[in-house]
Regions:
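Active-site groove signature of glycoside hydrolases
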Residues: 1
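Glycan-recognition surfaces
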Residues: 4-5, 9-127
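Polar/charged alpha-helical tracts
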Residues: 12, 16, 102, 130-145, ...
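A generic structural motif
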Residues: 25, 53-54, 147-155
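Short, charged low-complexity intrinsically disordered segments located at boundaries
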Residues: 41-46, 139-149, 165-172
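Carbohydrate-binding surface patches
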Residues: 102, 106-120, 152-176
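Aromatic- and carboxylate-lined catalytic core of secreted/periplasmic carbohydrate-active enzymes
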Residues: 109-153
Length: 176
């Protein structure tokens, strides 16, 4: 029996044990979760910086990396709502203990809102400023109400996510 078959049997066992309770698969190979997990992490953990320290990029393909987590979320978007609900990991709005730029935080949170079904932050929202609260409300609304979400890849490797919100076409352009 292959490792993949063993993993699939383990997921079937978990599904049987959980019955109708929802399962969020985190760390499970994405294909073995098809139809068995209700939600599944689609990439690596995000980091408090953009792409981890330089030497980790030399040794570890699968590592903590906000950049790589975003790449996985975008490139595995077709699984969302088909195989399971996608969990792109958390986003950050906070300033303390976070080295992401304001633009990087906006990209991370907006991509998570548009392309995932699990929308979580590791921040403590009670500490948010009024501006951060307003941004959280905007993102929450985006996660719940955005329609016709489409992703395009430009020749230069940049992404453009187009979506409709309140009857208007909006877009987010970014490069990883």
């Amino acid at each position: 029996e292959s490792r993949a078959a063993r993993m699939y049997r383990a997921m079937e066992l978990l599904r049987g044990w959980c019955g109708e309770k929802q399962i969020l698969g985190c760390g499970v190979p994405v294909m073995t979760a098809f139809g068995l997990a209700d939600y599944c992490r689609v990439g690596c953990d995000v980091s408090l910086d953009w792409d981890d320290v330089w030497y980790m990029r030399l040794f570890h393909r699968e590592r903590v990396s906000t950049r790589q987590a975003l790449n996985n979320t975008v490139l595995r978007r077709q699984l969302n709502g088909r195989a399971y609900g996608s969990d792109p990991d958390v986003f950050f709005l906070r300033e303390e203990n976070c080295r992401l730029t304001t633009e990087q935080k906006k990209i991370l949170a907006t991509v998570n809102a548009l392309l995932g079904q699990v929308f979580l932050t590791s921040d403590m929202p009670v500490r948010y400023t009024e501006q951060q609260r307003a941004e959280y409300r905007r993102l929450r609304t985006l996660a719940e109400q955005a329609e016709q979400v489409q992703v395009e890849t430009a020749e230069n490797g940049a992404f453009c996510i187009r979506y409709r919100m309140d009857g208007k076409t909006e877009q987010l352009r970014f490069r990883l």
